C-alpha cells in the first residue's frame, strides 16, 4: 500500500545514482552475504521521468497537470519522488495536492461539489503538502507490488479565489512540479502451473511466483502443502496474491501461522487471461529455513455462446431485427441440458458476443450482435464482455443503461446485474454483492417498481469490463425456473456526460498522446458534469447580467455625440466601433439562455479588445492637439500596432498599455511645449481642469483600478458594466474643445441634403439636330 515518506536534502533535480541509492535503501538489509548476492541477481532497477509542468490553482479538471506512467510487469517496488520548485523566492507557501490512480486518471473533487445521480465517485488516494515541506525534503510515495500497466498522477494548487487576474499587471509566481518513477522488478520469477506442485524454500528474502489464469476460470485454490520450519513447528509463511491498485486495493493476504503443515486461499472469479503475482515471505527469525510445496488448482467452466449460428437455427425464417432475434427459452434449456452431459463440464455462463464501434475520439458504442436485447435466465448469468483496454478509453465517461418491460418483471422476480473489471461476477445464487477475487463490482437491479437502471463511470480503468445479469427470485426460487426476461442494454463511452449540459463546455485535453476530457462550467454551475446548481445563477440573473453588460455600452453614445459636435469624425467612428463590438461580444459571451452571437466568439472578442485599445489611443492623441497630418498618421500607425500586439497576446495588459503610454508621452510633451511657449499652464482655463480634465482622469483611474484588481467571476457582470460606463464617460470628459476655425457640427455641414445646380464647363464636341 502506498505510504508517504521523506528523506535526503532538497534538490532541484536528483541524479540517477542518487535515485537508485534511495530505492535500494528502502529494502531491508541482507541477512547473509550469499543470500544477498542471490537476491540481487534476480532484481533490476529502472528509472522513468517526465518533463516538469507548471501548476495552476484549481478551478476545473483542465487546470490540473496530468502525468502518465507505465509500470512494467513483475514490479515488486515502486517509488515516486516528487520534486517541486518555485519561480521566485517571494512566492507564497501554497499547498500542493497530488492524486494517484491505477488504470485511469484520478476522479477528484477539490471543490466538494455533487456528482450526477448514479455516478461512481470514489475518493482518490492523494497527498497534500506545503511547498516549503516539499522543497526541504524529497517527498516520496512507495507502493509494494504495484499492478503493471497505466498509472496516473494529477497535481494542482488549492482552489482558485475566482479573482480575474490581468496578465502582466501583477507579477505571477510559477510552481513547477516533476515526478520521477523508480521501479524494482524481478527477472527470475518461477511459473506455477495448474495442478503441478512446486517446491519452495524461504530464508530471508521473498520468493516470487506467477500464475496464468485462463478465461472462464470460476475459482482458484492456492495451496501450501508440507510446510515445515527448521526451528519451530507450524508454517510461518505469509502469502500475498495480486497487485496493489489505487485508490482501492484488493490484494489478498494469507498468513499461515498455525501448527497445521498446510493452508490454502480460495479466490472466486480471479482475473481472466492474465498473470497473477504470488509472493511468499517467511515470518520466521533470520537464518531460519522454511520449506513448502505450492500448488494451484483451477475450477473452470464452459461458456454457452449465443452466436449467429444458434440464432439462425432457432429462427431460420426470420430476419435479424430486435423482435426476431430471440433465443427460444425451450431451445436454450434443451441445448444446455444436452451439452452439459459432455465430459468437458457444465456451463457456467451465457456469453453474448458484443460489437464494439468506435465513433470518435473517446467515443465508443457497444451492442450485442443479436440486437440491443439480452435474455436473462435464472439458471446461469448472461455475460457481456466490454473491451475498454485500448489505453485510450479511460479518458471519458462510460454509461450503462438497463431497461425492461414492466410486464416482464413481476413482484417476486428481480434482475440483478453486476459490472466488474477483469472477470465477471458469477455467484448470483449465493450473493448479490458483485465481489470477485480482486474487484468490488457495481450492482444494478431491475424490479417491478423500477424497470430502468443506469450507471455512470467517469474515467473507467483500462481493462476488460464485464456486465453479468441473472434472474433472481429471493422469495420463491421455483418461480424463476422457467422465466426469461428480456433486458435492453445501452452501453456507450463518451467524452462528457450529456456534453456537460447547457451550462458547460466539454473540452478535450491532451498530455502527449493521451487524450481525456473535462467540463468547464459557466453561470455559477459546478461539478463533474456541470450539474451542481448550489451556486448557479437563475435565469433572471443571467438575463440581468446580459442586459447590464450590453446596455452599459450605450454610454459610448455620449462621446460619439460630443465627437461629432466638435468635428472629431475619426474619434466618433472608433467609439461607435467599440460600442458595437463590445455590445455583441458580451451578448455572445453569456452562458445559458441569454446568448446572441452574430459572428464567431473569437472574432467578437478580438474586435472588442481592439476597440478598447483604439479608443484610448485616439482619445489621448486628440488631447495632444497635433497637426492634422501628423495626427492622422499616428492614429493609423497606433491602431495597426495595437492590432499586431493583440494578435501576439490578446490578454497581455502591456500590449494595450504600451501604445497608450506612448500616446500619453506625446500628449505630455505637447502640453509642456505649449506651457513653455505661452508662459502659462496648459490648458489655460481653470474651468477646463475642474469640470472636464479632473473628472475624466478620476473616472479613468477608478476604471483602471476596478479592471485590474476588483473583478471576480462572481461580480464580473456588474463590475465590468461599470468599467464600460467609466471608460466611455472618461472619453466624453477628456475630449478637447473643437478647433477655433470649426463650427458646431461642421463635419455634418459638408454633407448637403438639398439639390444644387452645377455649371457644365465641358465643350460640346457635336450637336444633335
Swiss-Prot record:
GO biological process, one term: lipid metabolic process
GO terms under cellular component: lysosomal membrane; plasma membrane
Gene ablation phenotype (knockout): Embryonic lethal with anterior-posterior axis formation defects in embryos from 6.7 dpc on until cessation of development at latest in 10 dpc.
Database matches in InterPro entries: EGF-like_dom (IPR000742), NGX6/PGAP6/MYMK (IPR021910)
Domain EGF-like: from-to ranges: 495-531
Disulfide partners: 496-506, 500-519, 521-530
Signal peptide positions on this chain: 1-33
Alphabetic keyword roster: Cell membrane, Disulfide bond, EGF-like domain, Glycoprotein, Hydrolase, Lipid metabolism, Lysosome, Membrane, Signal, Transmembrane, Transmembrane helix
PTM annotation: Glycosylated.
Annotated EC: 3.1.1.4
Spans through the membrane: 544-564, 568-588, 604-624, 628-648, 652-672, 689-709, 716-736
Subcellular locations according to the entry: Cell membrane; Lysosome membrane
Glycosylation: residue positions: 138, 411
GO MF entry, a single one: phospholipase A2 activity
Extracellular topological intervals: 34-543, 589-603, 649-651, 710-715
Principal place of residence: membrane
Function, in words: Involved in the lipid remodeling steps of GPI-anchor maturation. Lipid remodeling steps consist in the generation of 2 saturated fatty chains at the sn-2 position of GPI-anchor proteins (GPI-AP). Has phospholipase A2 activity that removes an acyl-chain at the sn-2 position of GPI-anchors during the remodeling of GPI. Required for the shedding of the GPI-AP CRIPTO, but not CFC1, at the cell surface. Shedding of CRIPTO modulates Nodal signaling by allowing soluble CRIPTO to act as a Nodal coreceptor on other cells.
Family named by the database record: Belongs to the TMEM8 family.
Full protein name: Post-GPI attachment to proteins factor 6
Organism whose genome encodes this protein: Mus musculus (Mouse)
Gene: Pgap6
